[in-house]
UniProtKB/Swiss-Prot annotation:
PANTHER family: NUCLEOID-ASSOCIATED PROTEIN YBAB
Entry keyword Endoplasmic reticulum: no
Subunit comment: Homodimer.
Any one GO MF annotation of this record: DNA binding
Organism from which the protein derives: Moorella thermoacetica (strain ATCC 39073 / JCM 9320)
Name under which the protein is recorded: Nucleoid-associated protein Moth_0028
Family as reported in the entry's similarity comment: Belongs to the YbaB/EbfC family.
Localisation: Cytoplasm, Nucleoid
């Protein structure tokens, strides 16, 4: 591989790194929402897989059945995190051309 090709490849990698850094910043602002129990529990997560909001309909709060509410919260959180990860994977593929980078 000639030096010209090596320099070109290095520039492409630097450009990709800058795009990834910009995307990571943007993903902190993008959100996905998931719900469980017909919408009585709603969870919002950002592209960094951080929960940013949880809403629970007061009708879902039954002191006699706390376990049901816990299950609904878990289901909504897991779905929101799954959607968030899918969003990250899609956006990273646009930059990397489906090259898997560590940590994404």
């Amino acid at each position: 591989m000639g030096m010209g090709n090596m320099n070109k490849m290095m520039k492409q990698m630097q450009k990709m790194q800058a795009q990834v850094a910009r995307l990571q910043e943007e993903l902190g602002e993008r959100t996905v929402e998931a719900s469980a129990g017909g919408g009585v529990v709603k969870v919002t997560a950002n592209g960094r897989q951080e929960l940013v909001n949880i809403k629970i309909d007061p009708a879902a709060v039954d002191p006699e059945d706390v376990e049901m509410l816990q299950d609904l919260i878990l289901a909504a959180v897991n779905e929101a995190l799954h959607q968030s990860q899918e969003m990250v994977t899609r956006e990273m593929a646009k930059i990397t051309g489906n090259i898997r980078l560590p940590g994404f």
